Regions:
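Structural signature of nuclease core domains in nucleic-acid processing machines
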Residues: 1-211
Length: 211
């Protein structure tokens, strides 16, 4: 129900795994149903459940009102950048989709406002989240339960924590520190994932190609 935004750096740090966990589960189910086929993810998207309101200083036509409503309801997340997949997700798309976070420039390439990944990048994200979930599970089973909140830019784990009043964390007491998480751009996040996973999933690090 919240207006959630996909954050690749937050995913790398293990703070935003749920959407990819769901995608992986769906892919595993489809792989069991269709063992003779390659399962390719098309997208992983958030849909904000809301009742949009249109405000305007000028009178709008019914079509203009509908376009603004669709704009507010457009899903966000990540879409596979293969053209046939995008056409299946939004068959009526022109230069800008009202359904998925994809826009095209005049030359047909995706604009900077688009949220697309290649199938290789989606595969890397999928493998990394599976690795991260196993890692976190092993830490839980190993008894790791330290009070160790993060700070990433202006975001702090304690801000909306339901247990803030009982956990006892106080940065004013010596020994209590937040984990300071570095901001990562898209390529840095992908390369950091590759470093943890090893050569099998390497599509960025060591490459001279720009992304």
């Amino acid at each position: 129900s919240g207006d959630r935004r996909f954050d690749l750096a937050a995913l790398y740090y293990g703070l935003q795994l749920q959407l990819v966990v769901y995608m992986n589960a769906a892919m595993e189910m489809e792989a069991r149903r269709h063992p003779d086929k390659e399962i390719v993810p098309a997208a992983m998207l958030y849909y904000h459940v809301t009742d949009p309101m249109v405000e305007s200083q000028v009178e709008l036509s019914p079509q203009e009102i509908n376009e603004q409503i669709l704009e507010q309801l457009r899903m966000n997340g990540v879409v596979c950048g293969e053209e046939d997949i995008i056409q299946r997700l939004d068959r009526e798309m022109g230069d800008k989709s009202t359904v998925i976070p994809v826009e095209k420039k005049k030359d047909g390439s995706y604009s900077a406002r688009s949220s697309v990944m290649s199938s290789q990048e989606l595969g890397l994200v999928s493998a990394y989240v599976s690795h991260k979930v196993r890692q976190i599970g092993q830490e839980i089973l190993g008894g790791h339960k330290e009070v160790n909140p993060y700070e990433k830019g202006s975001n702090e784990a304690c801000t909306y924590c339901a247990y803030k009043k009982v956990c006892g964390f106080d940065p004013g007491i010596p020994g209590y520190r937040r984990r300071l998480l570095k901001e990562l751009d898209r390529q840095e996040a992908f390369e950091s994932m590759e470093e943890e996973l090893g050569d099998e999933h390497r599509i960025y690090a060591g490459s001279t190609e720009g992304h």
